[in-house]
Amino acid sequence: MKITSQEEYGLRLLIRIAGCKDKQGMSIPQLSEAEGLSSHYVAKLARVLRMGGFINSTPGYKGGYVLAMPADKIVINKVLKTLGGSLFDKDFCETHSGKLNLCTNSVECSSRSLWQMIQFIVDQFLDQVTLHDLSNSEKKPVNIFDELLDQSTKTFSAKNIVSDRL
């Protein structure tokens, strides 16, 4: 599993915009310089974030990008799925069946169960992390993760996760 550059840089741009004190927001050149990315790539990422409803743009000489809603309302799981999708897409088995039209393991597939459990746990965590959490302190997501781990020992069951996803 890998985090794509679009997910990483898109999230970094969003954190940078959230931390901007200027009411005009940040322009593409400002974001480009701050993150060390090309203006073209920043524009592409900004378009994806704008289409996802996370940022608004103000055109013109003094224009820029601002958050479309308060940072505490922007859920990181939604941001990452907008930028790149799920780690394990439910259609994965249909598109990665090798030379056959149908995966030979489609009825009994232990690797699919593993990916579904990992996706479930990642979703549970990322659904609790907001842009506000990331733009204020690195400790906040760690605290959320610790709380989730405490809950997981009480409530998560691999049988429930897999059967709910099939």
Where would I find each of the regions flagged by the language model?
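Alpha-helical residues within the helix-turn-helix
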Residues: E33, R50-M51
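Conserved segment of winged-helix/HTH DNA-binding domains
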Residues: A71-H96, S111, M117-I121
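Beta-hairpin "wing" of winged helix-turn-helix
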Residues: G52-K62, V66-A68
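C-terminal regulatory/oligomerization modules of transcriptional regulators
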Residues: E94-L166
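Short amphipathic alpha-helical interface segments
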Residues: G10-D22
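A short alpha-helical element within helix-turn-helix/winged-helix DNA-binding domains
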Residues: M26-G36
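Key DNA-contact positions within bacterial/archaeal DNA-binding proteins
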Residues: H40
